[in-house]
UniProtKB/Swiss-Prot annotation:
PANTHER family per the UniProt record, alphabetical: OS07G0671800 PROTEIN, REF/SRPP-LIKE PROTEIN OS05G0151300/LOC_OS05G05940
Protein name (record): Stress-related protein
Family: Belongs to the REF/SRPP family.
Induction: By cold stress.
Domain of life: Eukaryota
InterPro entries, per the entry: REF (IPR008802)
Amino acid sequence: MAESEAKQQPETVHGEEKRLKYLDFVQVAAIYVIVCFSSLYEYAKENSGPLKPGVQTVEGTVKTVIGPVYEKFYDVPFELLMFVDRKVEASIYELERHVPSLVKRASCQAITVAQKAPELALAVASEVQRPGVVDTAKNITKNVYSKCEPTAKELCSKYEPVAEQYAVSAWRSLNRLPLFPQVAQVVVPTAAYWSEKYNQSVSYTAERGYTVALYLPLIPTERIAKVFQDGSALPTVETNGNAIPLAQ
């Protein structure tokens, strides 16, 4: 009895070592694609008519040539996926060490909100049973907004300072990369232009009485500019060794 338990323990550990922790969905997707391709191939072969003997001959030749190679390397893709999975695990561990605890708590709250989705779905289902599609849509929108707005504002207030700090730091780092300043000269003004157009469109539709516009967030362009100015990290581009601030 003790010997059988001792044998089962190494097998269990070996099975856990062979199990993917983060990229198992890739393996499942690959198996699904292979099954679909095999089914499609079998269907095409069965309906190939007079070409079926030729297809079977080619299939036998391919199996003869590829078979030994497959037997030798069939486990390589999984081992490569396992290697990447372990790297992802190490990266997540390092990220958890460096991410501020404030962000972790906010992330937990976001997960809690996501877990409440089934309750909201039940409320929506019961609401749809009432007559009037337009009234139902309005009630659903108000219900979602009233339930999510407090949590969203709380998460935003916690994430904003951390996100602003990392944004300034990331801009400083990116601005040192070759060719990035030249790309920024094109991208930043374009992004600012379309952000302003978006804000104008949302404001216009809200003034015209469209309900959906009341729930669309505006892009805080002025706040973004102020963050970079306060951090002494106004987006700049380097030309001839001189850093020139980009126009707002």
